[in-house]
Amino acid sequence: MDKDALREYLNTRRQGWPYEDSYHVDHMGGHRFVARIGDELAGLSYAEVNADSTEAVMKMNLKSQYAEYGIGTELLNLLMDDLQQSGFEPIRYEIPPERYAFQIYKNLGFSVERRDEETVRFIWRRHK
């Protein structure tokens, strides 16, 4: 996704956020996105990919004070779009159960693949 397309996408999605005047996301290449509030790093999303496979595992870190504003969802959406455009499928996302937010991942099209005491693993596949 080029910078102009990314900027347009974010401008249509972030209206009404308390940080909308200073919030921006940079595509760092290599399936990595960084969100900043002013000069402060707010969060990042990235993917672990295997050169011998079309599978990808998404990862995200978001500072707790920026939760509830849609920044994490935006980071995941951008990463998913990037992975899909690059032909990765399935896409997985793993989190500790205490951070389990089923509705967010369900809204992104994920379903629970596995749940145990240490990890909840979500999976996304293109519907055929």
Protein language model annotation of sequence segments:
Residues 1-8, 113:
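A short beta-loop-alpha structural element at the N-terminal edge
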Residues 5-57, 63:
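Acetyl-CoA-dependent GNAT
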Residues 30-32, 116-121:
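Short hydrophobic/aromatic beta-strand or adjacent loop that forms the aromatic wall/cage
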Residues 63-65, 69, 97:
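Active-site acidic-Proline motif in GNAT/NAT acetyltransferases
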Residues 68-81, 107:
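Conserved acetyl-CoA-binding loop-helix of GNAT-fold acetyltransferases
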Residues 79-83, 91, 101:
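Short hydrophobic clusters on alpha-helical segments that form packing/core surfaces
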Residues 92-102, 120:
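Conserved beta-strand-loop-alpha-helix junction that forms the acyl-donor binding cleft
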Residues 106-116:
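Conserved acetyl-CoA-binding loop of GNAT-fold acetyltransferases
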